[in-house]
Amino acid sequence: MEKELSLELCNAIAEAIIAKKELHGGSIDAYAKSLGISASIFSRLKKGERTNLIKPDKWLAIGRKLGVQIGTTTWRPVETDVYLEMQDDFSYCQQNAKALLLVDDCGIGKTYCARILIAKMHNAFYVDASQAKSKRLFIQALAREVGISTNATLAETLEDLRYYINALGGCFICIDEAGDLDYQAFLELKALINGTIGRCGWYMMGADGLRAKIQSGIKHRKVGYREIFDRFAARFRSITPDTKEERQAFYKKLFTDVAYQNLDDKNQLNAVIAKCYTKIDGQKTIPTDRSLRYLETLIKVAQQQNSNQ
């Protein structure tokens, strides 16, 4: 039996669909395809139709893609230092058709910030490479994101994709978890960048695995890695500081900024942040894995305990 969604949720997702079109410079058909619906369904949504128009699973998939919140979640997005740095990076890349490479710690909110920023940008697209590791899957994922049909051959889809990006102009494409791309996918990414010079900004994000993959490829003179590193300014950009003292200050501010905006009881602030620290040899140090995810869990537990009192 198919699940039923509330009219309230469908309305929220439909409103997000209509609003996002204003930021998509392509045709209605291309925009609709990027969401997995037809242009006629988009038109009917604009006219107010909801019932039996889209299957529940598709509603949910679109809602997730567009960042529509489900239920009564009170989690508040925060413009952290990570958010502000990435905002500057994204703007620079899009306005100047340049490419940058961000390699940083896990759990500082890179993906979360990227999704929020891209949702606000014109002609900006996001691909999670961990879900599209191979050459075929990567090209198809990017094609679907920008609104290109994937029914043609892979070579034709790639040509259509390159043509469409150039035709739109001023595009921005963020490749998250880029270290998961296999070798052939990396080569196609390089070809796409070469074929859209001056027409599209690119941004690759990942953690240590991405750095290791590129460095290893360059060291062993594997075709393409030196070229793609050069396209991305020949530099591994990082937001998290290198020195111990600066890192601790960075993480403390990151935790505090997020916790302050999301904790209702500010008296719990210091206690919650303190739990994000681990002790090694009797000294406090900050974990570098799942930091903000752990903080989010602590905050939600604290909120639940308060509501039960």
Where are these regions (language model features)?
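C-terminal alpha-helical "lid" subdomain
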Residues: 1-30, 34-68, 235, 240-309
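Short C-terminal boundary/hinge segments that cap the last helix of small helical domains
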Residues: 67-81
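Pre-Walker A adenine-sensing motif
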Residues: 77-95
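Walker A/P-loop nucleotide-binding motif
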Residues: 95-116, 130-131
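Sensor-1/coupling segment of RecA-like P-loop NTPase cores
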Residues: 101-106, 195-224
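Conserved catalytic segments around the Walker B and adjacent sensor/switch elements
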Residues: 121-131
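A short helix-turn-beta junction within AAA+ P-loop NTPase domains corresponding to the substrate/partner-engaging
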Residues: 122-124, 217-240
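Mid-core helix/loop region of P-loop NTP-binding domains shared across ATPases and GTPases
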Residues: 134-135, 140, 149-190, 194-201, ...
